[in-house]
Amino acid sequence: MDVSQYLEIFIDETKEHLQTLSDQLMILEQEPENTDTINEIFRAAHSLKGMAGTMGYKRMQRLTHDMENVFQEIRSGNMKVKPELVDVLFRGLDALDAYLNNIINTADEGTEDNEEIINA
């Protein structure tokens, strides 16, 4: 599938989802039990995962998949939101932003795997 025709849409929608993640993570930092915020972050990560996968951006897909998994654990009560987790999530957001900037500049997400974030 030739995805080049969808690149501009992908970039615009990714910017929106990253802004949502940023806004909601700031709320989560202050209100770690806020279920609406937790659900909003889960949905944004899920949407980004699907979009990245469709476009073939595997690194972005993997990172958002891992973020989605974390929020599924939080939603199910198996994990609590702690300051250390929020810090890791902000690092993940920074990595996603870097992937997007690479995509904007080169149409490629780059080669950084961000294993240290994924394994944190």
Question: Each PLM stretch: what is its role?
Answer:
Residues M1-A120:
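N-terminal assembly/transducer modules of large multi-domain enzymes
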